[in-house]
Amino acid sequence: MDYSKLPSQEIERLARTIHPGAWAIEPERPLATLLGSCVAVCLFDPQARVGGLNHFMLPNIRRGSNDDVDSLLSGAYAMEALLNALLQRGAKKLRLQAKAFGGGTIINTSGPSMSIGLRNAEFTKEWLDREGIPLLASDFLGPWSRKVLFLPMTGDAFCRRMVTNMATAETIAREEKSYADTLAQKPKSTEKKIELF
């Protein structure tokens, strides 16, 4: 099915939703996510026609009481997991292209530390640069939440900025907390972990 010819509302209806801390590769089905301070990165190999999207909450692993949960929500984990999965599906690192979105300031933070959204955006640009993957398009920062749709077959990405009202901010915060809580309740895995390099 050629999703690129459908109206955006239909693409959104048919899309697989990617929640905070998750990533996915689909051969054809569109991928969608809702972002606040989080960032989503779309990686695509135009020759292999394979792509995927991730959604992360924090740039790096925090040291704390639940390192397993924090690592699953981190950009470092999300980027390596998506990259490795794409390579397993036939993508070549030299051909990969990126589009990235998010890092909004939807909840005011005070204090001297850099906002989570800004840290996420900076991490994304630095990671892509370090890996030699060109960032073809981006929409970072600002007071907006964003709805992102990605067509993995074509590499097309659509980003809709949304004025963040209290209801939207609460929905995003609730989704992020729910996902983090779900991860915290899972038993620790004995499976081989992704090697971050």
Swiss-Prot record:
Family, per the entry? Belongs to the CheD family.
List keywords of the entry alphabetically.
Answer: Chemotaxis, Hydrolase
Q: Which PANTHER family match?
A: CHEMORECEPTOR GLUTAMINE DEAMIDASE CHED 1-RELATED, CHEMORECEPTOR GLUTAMINE DEAMIDASE CHED-RELATED
Gene Ontology MF terms in the entry: protein-glutamine glutaminase activity
Top-level class of the enzyme under EC nomenclature: hydrolase
Q: Biological process (GO) annotations?
A: chemotaxis
Q: Name one Pfam family in it.
A: CheD
> What's the encoding gene here?
cheD2
> Per its record, how is this protein called by name?
Probable chemoreceptor glutamine deamidase CheD 2
**Protein EC:** 3.5.1.44
> Would the keyword Hydrolase be found if you checked this record's keyword annotation?
yes
